[in-house]
Amino acid sequence: MNKRKILIIVAILFILIGTILLCFPSASNYIYEKNVETEKEKFVVKITDEQNENILDKLYKKLQEENQKIYEEKQNKLVDPFSYEQSAIDLSEYGIENNVIGYISIPKINIEVPILLGANTANMKKGAVHLTETSYPIGGVNTNSVIAAHRVYGKATLFRYIDKIGVGDKIRIRNFKEELTYEVYETKIINPDDISELEIEEGQDIITLITCHPYRINTQRYIVKAKRVWNTTLCLF
């Protein structure tokens, strides 16, 4: 084989390798999305089974009590946005597997990911996480549910494009009982030790999304704040 043919083969191999590397993130994210879809279907079957209605009502009441307690204690255990690894609630006691309390959907950036209780490393590999010591994502007056996620983790695009979300955009949370819709009213960049944005606002029903910023540098935090609205008919499932 002459030198020219060898160079052509090597060039073709480099092109093939480059193409594979370019396609790999998209393919990996597609696989992640399909897995999320499959797990969501199982979740829906579980929460819509009439046999589970009573126990899920008990869970809902328990979380309402926890949210009231967090409010009354003025979130006195808040320290750092990413330090709340262990959930105070074991969802398996209520028949919910994988520690998934629901799903968050953000149409503007075309994502839908599970929400897991507890901001530990294992959970953050799987999707978004609820920060313990903030309100659980069931809505209600005097609540601020803080939901965190990586920008990207492995094969999953999570809050990668969070900075594309703007005022007026909708965020939907489908927990084990109902769908909640929130409208974005503020985005902001904060320091990692700034916990003031995670605090409950008197009389409000809000959620706060948080992730590292800037992307791949991670010296600050990017947050999105949204208030509860009821004038929508679009369903998550």
Task: Please place each PLM-identified region on the residue numbering.
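Positively charged n-region of N-terminal signal peptides that target proteins for export
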Residues: 1-5
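Solvent-exposed, non-transmembrane regions of membrane-associated and secreted proteins
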Residues: 8-237
